[in-house]
Amino acid sequence: MAIVKCKPTSPGRRHVVKVVNADLHKGKPYAPLLEKNSKNGGRNNNGRITVRHIGGGHKHHYRVVDFKRTKDGIPATVERLEYDPNRSANIALVLYKDGERRYILAPKGVNAGDVIQSGVDAPIKAGNTLPMRNIPVGSTVHNVELKPGKGGQLARSAGAYAQIVARDGAYVTIRLRSGEMRKVLSEGRATIGEVGNSEHMLRELGKAGASRWRGVRPTVRGVVMNPVDHPHGGGEGRTSGGRHPVSPWGMPTKGFKTRKNKRTDKYIVRRRNK
């Protein structure tokens, strides 16, 4: 994988930094694992904006990724690595010995031709998926299940991982990249190793248009809006906003805690690092 800095042949190219992976598949994705992915521009069924900064962007299909990894005891060979426009991580197309193909998150160090496996008897090797009760303490994992059988929900983006730091009865304690330590059920599954494409964080889009290609619209500051649009809006000339920073709906921002799910507080051993 190479980091390529573009020559400044135009203002839009001057700051572009690309991450080039020669191992990625150059052709089309595997058609049976594609689904329609319609755009909604951040609008709900009433046509009102519910998520800002969404709109436009290149058309693409959704790749059906197997986050559950429940095909136990059947080895699978990695056929190829592919780019996925729906996530920062790359994905791998694997062929099981019974002939079925699936997409999985491409772990770091796993390449075409490697053999992976799922189940309680799977060896501790990058790309293999096991219940966390069978994974040694200290191991690095990704695609961690919060609820057994639901599929992995934690540590799925490029370069992400969690570490198993303790095991206590029905629970294991994991440390996340944010510094948070939390308990999860030991029956839940996780995949050994960390997610690949960790160089994703080094890329520079270089221009606003590159964000628009990805369906991301501009973020406008509240102080330049009108009073009808934002609590910081209005005033004659440039103003400081006149109050502590808030969201467009009046909720304090910049450090204000918004976590509401008290039901799961008991599973958080230590809050994330600030």
Swiss-Prot record:
| Highest taxon listed in the record's lineage | Bacteria
Q: Which residues pair up as cystines? A: none
Entries under Pfam families matching the protein: Ribosomal_L2 (PF00181), Ribosomal_L2_C (PF03947)
In its UniProt record, which GO terms are filed under biological process? Answer: cytoplasmic translation
Q: Kindly state which keywords UniProt assigns to this record, in alphabetical order.
A: Ribonucleoprotein, Ribosomal protein, RNA-binding, rRNA-binding
GO MF terms on file? rRNA binding; structural constituent of ribosome; transferase activity
Provide the residue span(s) of the region labelled Disordered. Answer: 223-264
GO cellular component labels:
large ribosomal subunit
Q: What residues form the membrane-spanning segments?
A: none
Q: Which Gene3D superfamilies match?
A: 2.30.30.30, Nucleic acid-binding proteins, Ribosomal protein L2, domain 3
Q: Sorted alphabetically, which PANTHER family does this protein's record hold? A: LARGE RIBOSOMAL SUBUNIT PROTEIN UL2M, RIBOSOMAL PROTEIN L2
Assembly, per entry: Part of the 50S ribosomal subunit. Forms a bridge to the 30S subunit in the 70S ribosome.
Q: What does this protein do?
A: One of the primary rRNA binding proteins. Required for association of the 30S and 50S subunits to form the 70S ribosome, for tRNA binding and peptide bond formation. It has been suggested to have peptidyltransferase activity; this is somewhat controversial. Makes several contacts with the 16S rRNA in the 70S ribosome.
What family, per the record? Belongs to the universal ribosomal protein uL2 family.
- Name the record gives this protein: Large ribosomal subunit protein uL2
Question: In which organism is this protein found?
Answer: Vibrio campbellii (strain ATCC BAA-1116)
Taxonomic classification? Bacteria, Pseudomonadati, Pseudomonadota, Gammaproteobacteria, Vibrionales
Gene name tied to this protein: rplB
